[in-house]
Amino acid sequence: MNKSQVISAWSNGRSGRTANGSLTSSTDGTLRSYNLVIGIHTANGFIVGDFTSSGTYYSNTTSTHVGNASQVAPIVSVDDFKVAQTELAWL
């Protein structure tokens, strides 16, 4: 799959993976750039953490993945993203 197809799979609750495995989606609602969770499905919809140079930088590739995912989900601060992840863990 290409990146756009993986993002589409994620936003539709399906699993997907790029050929090199750098971007993966899971049926548990997570989107990963390498091993870093960059997107989740919350009760209010999908969100993406701002792991970019304007937020909490991780890598160039991850920044690109965040940008791709922002086409289907809003970007939130990494702090807000971590709070949402914690809330999901309690469900």
Question: Residue locations for each model-derived region?
Answer:
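Terminal leader/tail segments of proteins
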Residues: 1-91
